């Protein structure tokens, strides 16, 4: 595990910067990007032409994913979508890869699970939604296990897995943040897993800076809003972010796009010191013991990895809520019900 702000975090930051422009490094890596793109295209073609058959798990599947690497806001989107599907009369379940956990077979993630056993994002989703969550690198196996354990589930939401073509899907939603497709190059020359032109049913864009939407069809704004912070040791104790304005604050995040979390706090009137941790940082020990601050603000994704042994009274958790466009919800619901949206 890399230390905070260590080599891995610095490498992630360097690549993120390079992927936003077509500099010398990006051009040098384009031959590798061509190979990557060819392999990805062959795999897509194999399923599109029927040479490989996707597996129908018996209920509609909504995939919430991205075509770029790094965090874009998928997890709060999945949580909001599950709530919206419930409100529309569905009984949703969720499947995920379980990244960061040593998962080899389909595994249920419950509110009592540990992040090390099922992954931080699936655990957060389970705690926020109360819906059945199963994880496995083979999402088909995860979906089949979920259905066997919960036969009342009538729609499955796949957290990520856009490129997991073996899982048949009814709806594909692609989430972007303000970086969109970066320099437009495929990995490793750019951030793209697939071309921006890839088919999807709808695109969601979270851009807290300009709020502008790209001129793509079926594109909707995704608003991520921070709520009142809650105390890690006393979750019932809550404080509006504005109350931290006159305190010495450290903001720390082990997520795919930590700068977005920091920008959210700044937009709330705070001026925190910041620390970017590697994505899925394991928190084997307390990296904040030497920080002379009054409060430490962390993400919900990081909070689920901090067990009962953590006793740092300065830790506050900032929840984020996703607001989905009602037109997007209507589009998804109509597709799930087998009708074209009006």
Swiss-Prot record:
GO terms for molecular function: ATP binding; tetraacyldisaccharide 4'-kinase activity. It catalyses: a lipid A disaccharide + ATP = a lipid IVA + ADP + H(+). Pathway: Glycolipid biosynthesis; lipid IV(A) biosynthesis; lipid IV(A) from (3R)-3-hydroxytetradecanoyl-[acyl-carrier-protein] and UDP-N-acetyl-alpha-D-glucosamine: step 6/6. Its EC number is 2.7.1.130. One of its GO terms (biological process) is lipopolysaccharide core region biosynthetic process. It comes from the Bacteria. ATP binds at residues 68-75. Disulfide bonds: none annotated. Belongs to the LpxK family. Transfers the gamma-phosphate of ATP to the 4'-position of a tetraacyldisaccharide 1-phosphate intermediate (termed DS-1-P) to form tetraacyldisaccharide 1,4'-bis-phosphate (lipid IVA). This is Tetraacyldisaccharide 4'-kinase. It comes from Burkholderia lata (strain ATCC 17760 / DSM 23089 / LMG 22485 / NCIMB 9086 / R18194 / 383). The gene is lpxK.
């Amino acid at each position: 595990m890399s230390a905070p702000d260590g080599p891995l975090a610095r490498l992630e930051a360097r690549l993120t910067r390079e992927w936003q422009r077509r500099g010398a490094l990006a051009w040098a890596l384009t031959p590798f990007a061509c190979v990557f793109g060819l392999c990805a295209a062959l795999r897509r073609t194999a399923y599109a032409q029927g040479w490989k058959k996707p597996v129908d798990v018996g209920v509609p599947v909504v995939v919430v994913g991205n075509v770029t690497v790094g965090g874009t806001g998928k997890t709060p989107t999945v949580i909001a979508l599950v709530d919206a599907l419930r409100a529309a009369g569905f009984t949703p379940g969720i499947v995920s890869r379980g990244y960061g956990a040593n998962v080899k077979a389909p595994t249920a993630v419950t509110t009592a699970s540990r992040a090390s056993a099922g992954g931080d994002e699936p655990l957060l989703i389970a705690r926020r939604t109360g819906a059945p969550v199963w994880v496995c690198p083979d999402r088909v196996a995860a979906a089949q296990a979920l259905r066997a354990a919960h036969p009342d589930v009538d729609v499955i939401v796949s957290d990520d897995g856009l490129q997991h073509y073996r899982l048949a899907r009814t709806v594909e939603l692609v989430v972007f943040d303000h970086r969109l497709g970066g320099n437009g190059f495929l990995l490793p020359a750019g951030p793209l897993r697939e071309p921006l032109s890839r088919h999807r049913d709808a695109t969601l864009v979270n851009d807290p800076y300009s709020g502008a939407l790209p001129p793509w069809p079926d594109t909707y704004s995704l608003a991520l809003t921070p709520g009142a912070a809650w105390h890690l040791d006393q979750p019932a104790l809550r404080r509006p972010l504005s109350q931290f304005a006159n305190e010495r604050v450290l903001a720390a995040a082990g997520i795919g796009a930590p700068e977005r979390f920091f920008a959210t706090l700044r937009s709330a009137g705070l001026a925190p010191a910041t620390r970017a941790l590697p994505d899925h940082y394991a928190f084997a020990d307390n990296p904040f013991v030497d920080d002379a601050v009054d409060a430490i603000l962390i993400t919900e994704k990081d909070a689920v990895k901090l067990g009962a042994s953590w006793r740092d009274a300065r830790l506050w958790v900032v929840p984020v809520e996703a607001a989905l466009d009602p037109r997007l919800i209507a589009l998804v619901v109509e597709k799930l019900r087998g009708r074209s949206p009006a």
